[in-house]
Structures are given as C-alpha cells and as structure tokens.
C-alpha cells in the first residue's frame, strides 16, 4: 500500500507539473487514444509537420469489468467455482513526446493488470517521419513516404492487434475479449514503412525474437522477420476499404511467445481453470496457444470495410510450427469475422457480433476446435468514455478425455467501462 501511494503521488506530481503542456495535446502522426483513434491502424503519415519545440503528452486509460460467466466440462478435471462480480480495475500510463521535427517517442506503462498488479513497462519506440535532425532537407522526398520505428515495442503482425484490448486501453475494441489466438508480442526491433500515393503500403521488420530481454544463453534465439503488404483507401465519403497480408517467422527461438506474450491477462477471469487456479497466475483464461514453442511461421490476412455506419473486419490466419521435441511441423488455423453497425449522433452507439473459430492439430495428435460467438453493444458517453455490454459463448471440441477442456464451454455476460485520454 505504501509503495502504491508513493507511486500515485509521483504520477499526480508528474501530471500536475506537465499540465502546461497538456493544453495542446495534438501530436504529428499520432493515433489518438480516444474515439478518434477507432479504425486507425498504423499511425497516420502526414508530411506537413507542426513541430515547434519539445512537447510532452501525458495520457492514460482505466477500465473496469463486471463478469457474469459460468463454465462447464465433462468433469474429468474439476473446474474452479466462479460467480458474478467485478474484476480488478486496470490502468495504463502513456507518455508521448515530440522530440524533433517528425521524431516522436512513445512509452506505455501498465499501472495495474491482471497478471501484474504492480506497475511495469510494456515497451516503447521512436517513430521517425523526417530526417531534418541529421541535416535540413536530408532525404526529404523519400521521407514523404517512409516511416521508421525502432524500439522494444509491439510488433506490427497483422491488423487484429490494432483492435485488441491492451490492458486498460480497450477503446479500440468493440467487444470485451480479444481473439482466441491473440497474436501479440513485444520484441526489440525495427520496422520500415513505405506508403504510396495510391493507397498501397508495405512494411518490413526485424526483431530479436525475445519477449524477455537477456544476454544469457547466446545462440538459442534467432531473429524474427516481419512483413506486411496492404491497401487502404477512402474510396468515397461513405466507403473505405482496406486489405492487408502479414507474416511473422522465426526458425530458432528458445521460446516463441506470439500467442502468449500478453502478460496483462485475458478479460474472462478464471474460466476453464482448475480448483487451484489464481486470477493473477492463470491469466490467459479463454485463450489458446497452439504450442509452437520453438519454431513458427504465421500468415494473417485482414479485410476491412466501412460503408457509412456499417463496418466489417475479418481475420484469416494460418500458422505452422513445432516445439524442439517434435519431429514434424503442425498447423493451426484461425478465422474471425466482426460485423459492427454504428449509429446515432456522431456514431456514438454501436451494436455488433463476432464469430471466432480456431482449429489445431495438437502435439498429442488430437484435432481440436474452439468456437466463440460474441454479441455486443456500446455507447460513447463522451469521446473519452465508452461503456460496453457483451454476451459470449465459447465451446471446446476434440480435446482428450483427460483434458480440462473436454466437453468444455463457458458463456455469460460481460460489462465494461473504459476511460481513455
């Protein structure tokens, strides 16, 4: 409690001390953390830069859920008893700093999360859209199209991670839970973007393949390669279309974390967990890791369109990989589709549904399937405050008779409120 009080005092002092900078909070080439950031994917690129000195933007978010879920299985493994109540409130602290013309820093700290009730740093990066800090006019024409990102940061694999809940930053997610196979990781690396004038863009990146950074055990983990090719165009005032294909691959890793890197935890607390489970330690409830521990190649295709208030976002994911103990590679597939309708003044209300299915050949030889149906609705009280309600129903099929997931299912209602600024 004393440590938390000291940290809270520090944050208050920081916010108060920087309040003068907070009057104009707009930054160049920046995804807004409020309603304006919805359906923004990569940070926008604008060659008209407004830098007039170092500017510090202090932001953050806080989210609270009420959970009313129940679960069941065959009884081979006893499930923990769960009831209806509130989950731990989560919070983020964001620092975004304009350091020079076209140069910006981002840093996110998780103040409170399911897995880590204590504060810890998620990661951060430098984003470079202009090279005048080297020499005025240096590569000026090229930098109208190029963006460079370097840091210990969230990899840009696929488009689904732009819509996922990141601890308390849940403004961009129209639902409460993320995908069953939640493709997300933070690694030290660099990404180079090229954006043309016709809507086409591409990205190539390299990372060190490590979630937990260390200089010990050299040679156990090789580099990870990332790539993305896409088209994103506002065809008319009413219609926007986007289509991307992405790849993430590493052929040698001490541990692949692509589907287990989110250490903040899932939104469905303690579902399908045994009687010894604790919310902070068994924090991936409701998610699925295909178990490609040491070698993986993943491809994701994401179509998106928005026509007036109607929007669709899809995910088609094909993954191959294995653990060192396996002699041959296995395959996993994930498909998801979201249909959202936004309505009312400034589209302040929405209703939507998502279907998500995962199939995988497990190391045991079992062919398993997990299906999830979500039905949700939301209302923006202001551009910084969103309330959501969701019905979720998840079914497990094909699991071994001794598995806790054998004939497993969970379903019920979730309520969530988020403040983000």
Where are these regions (language model features)?
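Outer-membrane beta-barrel pore domains
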Residues: 24-34, 71, 79-80, 125-130, ...
């Amino acid at each position: 409690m004393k440590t938390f009080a000291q940290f809270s005092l520090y944050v208050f002092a920081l916010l108060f001390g920087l309040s003068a900078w907070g009057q104009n909070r707009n930054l160049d080439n920046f995804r807004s953390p409020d309603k304006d950031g919805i359906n923004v994917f990569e940070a926008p690129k604008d060659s008209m830069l407004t830098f007039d000195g170092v500017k510090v933007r202090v932001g953050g978010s806080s989210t609270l859920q009420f959970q009313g879920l129940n679960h069941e299985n065959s009884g081979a493994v006893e499930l923990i008893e769960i009831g209806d109540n509130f989950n731990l409130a989560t919070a983020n602290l964001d620092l975004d700093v304009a350091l020079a013309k076209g140069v910006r820093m981002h840093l996110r700290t998780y103040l409170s999360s399911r897995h880590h009730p204590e504060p810890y740093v998620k990661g951060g990066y430098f984003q470079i859209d202009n090279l005048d800090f080297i020499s005025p006019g240096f590569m000026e024409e090229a930098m109208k199209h190029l963006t460079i990102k370097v840091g210990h940061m969230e990899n840009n694999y696929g488009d689904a991670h732009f819509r996922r809940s990141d601890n308390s930053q849940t403004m961009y997610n129209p639902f409460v839970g993320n995908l069953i196979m939640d493709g997300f990781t933070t690694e030290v690396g660099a990404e180079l973007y090229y954006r043309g004038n016709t809507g086409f863009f591409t990205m190539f990146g390299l990372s060190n393949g490590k979630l937990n950074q260390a200089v010990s055990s050299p040679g156990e983990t090789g580099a990870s390669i990332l790539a993305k090719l896409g088209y994103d165009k506002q065809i008319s005032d009413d219609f926007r279309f986007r289509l991307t294909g992405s790849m993430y691959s590493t052929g040698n890793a001490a541990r692949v974390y692509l589907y287990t890197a989110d250490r903040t935890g899932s939104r469905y607390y303690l579902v399908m967990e045994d009687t010894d489970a604790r919310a902070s330690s068994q924090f991936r409830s409701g998610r699925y890791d295909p178990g490609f521990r040491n070698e993986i190649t993943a491809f994701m295709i994401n179509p998106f369109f928005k026509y007036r208030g109607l929007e669709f976002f899809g995910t088609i994911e094909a993954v191959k990989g294995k653990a060192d103990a396996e002699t041959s590679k296995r395959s996993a597939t994930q498909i998801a589709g979201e249909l959202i309708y936004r309505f009312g003044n400034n589209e302040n209300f929405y209703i939507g549904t998502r279907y998500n299915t995962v199939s995988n050949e497990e190391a045991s030889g079992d062919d398993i399937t997990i299906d999830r149906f979500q039905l949700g609705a939301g209302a923006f009280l202001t551009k910084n405050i969103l309330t959501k309600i969701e019905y979720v129903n998840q079914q497990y099929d094909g699991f071994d008779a001794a598995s806790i997931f054998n004939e497993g299912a969970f379903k019920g209602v979730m309520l969530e409120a988020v403040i983000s600024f």
